[in-house]
Structure formats: C-alpha cells, structure tokens
From Swiss-Prot:
GO terms for cellular component: cytoplasm. It comes from Aliivibrio fischeri (strain MJ11). Its EC number is 1.1.1.37. Pfam families: Ldh_1_C, Ldh_1_N. This is Malate dehydrogenase.
C-alpha cells in the first residue's frame, strides 16, 4: 500500500508524515512531496524512526515520482490561514494549487483515493472533481474532503464538557468544512444528554475552533498538529478499508445523492473501492434541522465557485 502526502514540508504535512511513519501497517510505502527543497530532508529525518514503513521524499515542480503507484493521496499543499482571514480568503491561492495537483493525479494515479485537506475544502473538492471529470477519470467514490478535524474537535469538546473519555465519544458531523456549514449532530451522541444551552454554546465553538487556534498562534500559523492527527485518522481508515477491513466508518465530504448539495459531509462506510455506502445520519433535532436548512445556500455557493473555477 502506497500513501503519498502532497504538501509534506508544511505544518500539516510534516505532522501527518510523522504520524503515518509511526502508524501505517508494516510494509507500507510513504512518499512525501512538496515544492520546497527541504522535503527529501524531512523524509531522511523520518527515515530514522524505527518502523517497518519505507519513506521517500521528493521536491521540485513535478509531483509525479511521489504519485506513481499511489493507492491513497492526501493533499495538504497550499497556504495557511492568518488572523483576520477566513477559509474562503485562501481560495485565490489554493484553488490553483489543487487544480494543478489534481491534473497530475489524473494522469499518474487516476485510480487512487484522494483526500483533500487544502482549504477551503467546500470548494477545493469541487475543483478536484471537475478536473478529474474533464480528464475522464472521475470516480466519486474515490474523492474525499477530509472533515475529520471537525469530528475530533467535537469528540474532544464533548468529552471535556461531560467529563468522559474522548476515545469513547463518537460525534457525527455533517454539512461542510467551514463556519456555519459544520454541523455536529450532538443529539446523536450515545449515552450523553445536552441541554439546549449546551448545544447552543458547543455548536459555534466547534464551528469556530479553527479561528480559536489561528488567533492563539498570533500570526504564527493555523491548526497544523490537530489537523495532522485528523488526516492521519482518516488516511489510516482508508488504508484499512482498501486492505479489506470491514465496518470502517468515517465522516467525510463526498459527492452523494445530491439531496442537500452536490457534495455533503456525513458518515461513510469505507470499502475496497473507497466509498462503500453513504450512511444515513438519522433524525435531526429541531435545532440541527434549522441549522442544516440555513447553511445550505452557503454550502451550495462554495461548491459553485469551485465548479466555475475549472470551467
């Protein structure tokens, strides 16, 4: 199994590479690519960690050597948020980066599962889909927007509030991956009850947690370490499912039946070909139903921007 991390010299990429070097199954290949010349050095550094995962680093303009034979490609390339920016401010730079990388994937490893981390995810996933479609290789079961950070934040904050072990908390998060489009389904957390006040406070905290980190880092970056952990969790789940493990479920932003929007995050059963089944997210509370309805215009608008960028 070969996993390629694209954007591997950045804050998310390095954290993700470290975690994957430690946690990928024995015999896996890990390829790191970034435009930055430091990338082979990042791989050399990680290669000294004693795990049965082989690692190679590539730099320069062309990601092809890193992509060749990849089963999973995780894209974290692009610029990070700074104070005062929201995820959509990143669009002007990151849209072009995702477009050109996806064009390379379409030629080099068109059958790979692709996990997009680069923000704004609501839009960059639509860009990747349109690029793959133009190249005649689009498989909607193999393209994912990685929204796992919203899930792990939800699990952490719920566990803190309710004094539980975060490893035992599961919170489905649906919608998209920015601001109001992030909808944690607190009504569905097993074994935990919330007051209306708790839901009203916790929901925006989860939605704005990225901004919390951007401001706390005071211009020194955005959420890189927790995002690395989230991307590792999603990447490992993909690897397990592709290897034949049954019952692997993660929330992700994928093209489904289009009920709410062309792309929508909800629980996905993963399998040998990527998306095995898009699972129902169950019944929503009145609060969640209202939040869902009021976010859809924003989400659809984000998707449209991505589609039009490639036209």
């Amino acid at each position: 199994m070969k996993v390629a991390v694209i954007g591997a010299a950045g804050g998310i990429g390095q954290a993700l590479a470290l975690l994957l070097k430690n946690r990928l199954p024995a015999g896996s290949d890990l390829a790191l690519y970034d435009i930055a010349p430091v990338t082979p050095g990042v791989a050399a550094d990680l290669s000294h960690i004693p795990t049965p995962v082989s690692i190679k680093g590539y730099c320069g303009e062309d990601p092809t050597p890193a992509l060749e034979g990849a089963d999973v490609v995780l894209i974290s390339a692009g610029v990070a948020r700074k104070p005062g920016m929201d995820r959509s401010d990143l669009f002007n730079i990151n849209a072009g980066i995702v477009k050109s990388l996806t064009e390379k994937i379409a030629v080099t490893c068109p059958k790979a599962c692709i996990g997009i981390i680069t923000n704004p995810v609501n839009t960059t996933v639509a860009i990747a889909a349109e690029v793959l479609k133009k190249a005649g290789v689009y498989d909607k079961n193999k393209l994912f927007g990685v929204t796992t950070l919203d899930v792990i934040r939800s699990e952490t904050f719920v566990a803190e509030l309710k004094d539980k072990d975060p490893g035992e908390i599961r919170v489905p998060v649906i919608g998209g991956h920015s601001g109001v489009t992030i909808l944690p389904l607190l009504s569905q957390v097993e074994g935990v009850e919330f007051t209306a006040e708790e839901v009203a406070a916790l929901t925006p905290r989860i939605q704005n947690a990225g901004t919390e980190v951007v401001e706390a880092k005071a211009g020194g970056g955005s959420a890189t370490l927790s995002m690395g952990q989230a991307a590792c969790r999603f990447g490992l789940s993909l690897v397990k499912a592709l290897s034949g493990e049954q019952g692997v479920v993660e929330c992700a932003y994928v093209e489904g039946n289009g009920e709410h929007a062309r792309f929508f995050a909800q629980p996905i059963l993963l399998g040998k070909n990527g998306v095995e089944e898009i699972q129902s997210y169950g019944e929503l509370s009145a609060f969640e139903q209202e939040a869902l309805e009021s976010m859809l215009d924003t989400l659809r608008g984000d998707i449209k921007i991505g589609e039009e960028f490639v036209q």
